């Protein structure tokens, strides 16, 4: 089944002003202007962005459940579930670690914090105390135990991605194992997919409003001028993320037979939504629909993307090591090679608990610094004011990384329709594909 969130008029393509990406661009520009010239009004528009993100979160759990459960139920070889998950985790581990190393290398080369000579004792630790407390409350054991929900209803009520994914995988396996007895349930879930994704399409029409409110609030509250003093750090992070996407992920894409720029062009509407809301979670349903439409099998999409939202956060990983070394440089703390290796190892573990929501990267950084004694947690006060401006880049890089991972794993598993994928990358797919609920064959 393929889902489109765009409706084309009969007899031709959509006019440019009706494309979601154009509307979101206009909304972002409008939000920046309003927040800059009327900051108080901009701050007051925060509920618009918050409301849109809540609307999207409302449907994330059903989308994941339906996609994963029906995808696994239709697998004839249940061993493939473990194989897909295993390959995805290997991919995540390799490229998440590479992102951490890239951030560390760039920070050592460009030294964005050098010359600031900040005395850590003069920093206001209270400003980051809440983030440090949240980080302190998070442990690896607690994170792993939290994947198992207390109740099925609780997982859906909280909208916890990993808990919903955990139950969905088990339920899909159970459906496949009961064979024909589970076929009516599978067909019902398949039919239910159509209205749920139609609901997603309806909610996406509010994306420009959400992006406008979120951007107006960001500029109104923090101001464009607030980034001037730390512009070098922001520029370094954006440049590093761009190079990671174009060179590292671009190389992975080329090795697997597609262009990273073509993929970015294909998911441009979702990327603009991430840019406007600073949350990759806001575009999760759209990404899942787009990747399935591009020819990736539902079983792969359903396993890779939701898992990647916790285990494949390239942008967050670049930010963590880059920001940690920036704080050390700014406070004149010399980190030995051993200190940096310790920082890398701790970051490899703490980054796995980061979620795709705004501010999660900052909390994860606090978790890392609280374990590494050499770098003061209070130093995070230096970047607290500009973190919001780096959040967009983190979310965009995370999002592109998960899109690439989905294609790569699908190709490894021979679960990628090459003809359909090439058409998607060339922009040759029709603008509207009817949503049809087709029965999914169950495993015997």
From Swiss-Prot:
Domain of life: Bacteria
This protein's GO CC annotations: plasma membrane
Places the protein is found: Cell inner membrane
Pfam families with a match to the protein in the record: SDF (PF00375)
Record Gene3D superfamilies: Sodium:dicarboxylate symporter
Membrane topology annotation: Multi-pass membrane protein
UniProt keyword list: Cell inner membrane, Cell membrane, Membrane, Symport, Transmembrane, Transmembrane helix, Transport
Similarity field: Belongs to the dicarboxylate/amino acid:cation symporter (DAACS) (TC 2.A.23) family.
Record function comment: Responsible for the transport of dicarboxylates such as succinate, fumarate, and malate from the periplasm across the membrane.
PANTHER family: AEROBIC C4-DICARBOXYLATE TRANSPORT PROTEIN, PROTON/GLUTAMATE-ASPARTATE SYMPORTER
Name listed for the protein in its UniProt record: C4-dicarboxylate transport protein
Name of the gene this protein is made from: dctA
């Amino acid at each position: 089944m393929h889902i489109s969130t765009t409706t084309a008029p009969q007899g031709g393509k959509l006019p440019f002003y009706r494309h979601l990406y154009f509307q979101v661009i206009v909304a972002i520009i409008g939000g920046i202007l309003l927040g800059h010239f009327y900051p108080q009004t901009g701050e007051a528009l925060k509920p618009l962005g918050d409301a849109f993100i809540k609307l999207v979160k409302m449907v994330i759990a059903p989308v994941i459940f339906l996609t994963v459960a029906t995808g696994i139920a239709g697998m004839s070889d249940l061993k493939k579930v473990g194989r897909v998950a295993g390959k995805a985790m290997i991919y995540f581990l390799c490229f998440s670690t590479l992102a951490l190393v890239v951030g560390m290398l760039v920070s050592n080369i460009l030294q964005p914090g050098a010359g600031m000579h900040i005395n850590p004792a003069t920093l206001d630790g209270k400003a980051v105390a809440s983030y440090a407390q949240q980080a302190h409350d998070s442990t690896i054991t607690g994170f792993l135990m939290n994947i198992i929900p207390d109740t099925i209803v609780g997982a859906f009520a909280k909208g916890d991605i990993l808990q919903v994914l955990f139950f969905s995988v088990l339920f899909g396996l159970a459906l496949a194992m009961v064979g024909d007895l589970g076929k009516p349930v599978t067909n019902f879930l398949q039919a239910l997919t159509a209205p749920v994704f139609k609901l997603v399409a309806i909610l996406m029409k509010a994306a420009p409003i959400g992006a406008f409110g979120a951007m107006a609030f960001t500029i109104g509250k923090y101001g464009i001028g607030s980034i001037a003093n730390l512009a070098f750090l922001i520029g370094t992070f954006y440049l590093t993320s761009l190079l990671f996407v174009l060179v590292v992920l671009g190389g992975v894409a080329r090795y697997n037979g597609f262009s990273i720029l073509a993929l970015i062009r294909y998911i441009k509407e979702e990327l603009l939504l991430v840019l406007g809301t600073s949350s990759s979670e806001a575009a999760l349903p759209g990404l899942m629909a787009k990747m399935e439409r591009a020819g990736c099998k539902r079983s792969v999409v359903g396993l890779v993307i939701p898992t990647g939202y916790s285990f494949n956060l390239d942008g967050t990983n670049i930010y963590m090591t880059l920001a940690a070394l920036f704080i050390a440089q700014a406070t004149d703390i010399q980190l030995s090679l051993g200190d940096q290796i310790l920082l890398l190892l701790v970051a490899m573990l703490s980054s796995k608990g980061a979620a795709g929501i705004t501010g999660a990267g900052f909390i994860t950084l606090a978790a890392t610094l609280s374990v590494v004694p050499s770098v003061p947690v209070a130093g995070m006060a230096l970047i607290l004011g500009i973190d919001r401006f780096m959040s967009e880049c983190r979310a965009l890089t995370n999002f592109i990384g998960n899109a690439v991972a989905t294609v790569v794993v699908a190709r490894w598993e021979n679960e990628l329709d090459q003809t359909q994928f090439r058409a998607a990358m060339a922009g040759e797919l029709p603008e509207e594909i009817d949503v049809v609920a087709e029965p999914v064959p169950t495993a015997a």
